[in-house]
Amino acid sequence: MRLIAHRGNLNGPNPLVENDPQRITYCIDEGYDVEIDVRYDHHTNMLWLGHDEPQHKVNWFWIAGRRDRLWIHCKDVATLHEFSTKTSGYNFFFHDKDDYTLTSK
């Protein structure tokens, strides 16, 4: 069984730690998978974590190092497209008001 920390939350919502890279690493170290919200900026080739807006900048190396434990919620179509061009086993998905969502794995 896999336990997934939604945005890095372990005990209910906590906006102060949601999608924070340090919190995500902590959850993974504690044995959890983590769902993260990601946006890709094609101008800078950087990735941003954040539910409603970009908040925490990370790079591809950071994502790749944790990819086996991440459930990557692509927050827009451009981010979905970028992840779909990668062949390194990322588990990503996109949805917008759907009854069901499929991931890439």
Which positions does each model-derived feature cover?
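Phosphate-group recognition and catalysis centered on beta-loop-alpha active-site segments
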Residues: 1-105
